[in-house]
Amino acid sequence: MRASMVRRMAAAASSSASSSLRPAPLALLPPIPLYRRLLRAHRKHLPAEMRLLGDEYLKSEFRAHRNIDNPAHLIGFLTEWQLYAQQVEGESWLGEKIDQAKVEKLSEQQVGQLYELMMAIKSRREGGEGEGQESP
């Protein structure tokens, strides 16, 4: 009886220790199901203007990365898009800033693209607010 209790306690301790020390691995979706999930998330959770911008960006990124040969790049690409899908579906991303560590890893071209995206969002917001103020 004592040995079985020790085994149960050891099993419980090892399972809780392993789960608390490292998160469970994220099961990556294949590219096409992930792409469809992202489009559905945009359709369900984003306003029309943001959806159009998001869908265009999503399509261009998936097209640009269609022929990736490096497995590390593929895993990184799919992981980040899957995390994005979870954020959009959970709506925890609203008003959230980009992690500084991720910004530091961006290339100059990516920083430029991010800046262009920020300016497009700002101009759409200002355009939308201006239209709302003009109508009586």
UniProtKB/Swiss-Prot annotation:
One Pfam family linked to the record: Complex1_LYR_2
Keywords annotated in UniProt: Chaperone, Gluconeogenesis, Mitochondrion, Transit peptide
GO biological process: gluconeogenesis; mitochondrial respiratory chain complex II assembly; succinate metabolic process
Transit peptide: 1-24
Residue runs in coiled coils: none
GO cellular component: a single term: mitochondrial matrix
Localization of this protein: Mitochondrion matrix
InterPro entries: SDHAF3/Sdh7
Oligomeric and partner information: Interacts with the iron-sulfur protein subunit within the SDH catalytic dimer.
Known function: Plays an essential role in the assembly of succinate dehydrogenase (SDH), an enzyme complex (also referred to as respiratory complex II) that is a component of both the tricarboxylic acid (TCA) cycle and the mitochondrial electron transport chain, and which couples the oxidation of succinate to fumarate with the reduction of ubiquinone (coenzyme Q) to ubiquinol. Promotes maturation of the iron-sulfur protein subunit of the SDH catalytic dimer, protecting it from the deleterious effects of oxidants. May act together with SDHAF1.
Record-stated family: Belongs to the complex I LYR family. SDHAF3 subfamily.
Name of this chain's protein: Succinate dehydrogenase assembly factor 3, mitochondrial
Organism: Pyricularia oryzae (strain 70-15 / ATCC MYA-4617 / FGSC 8958) (Rice blast fungus)
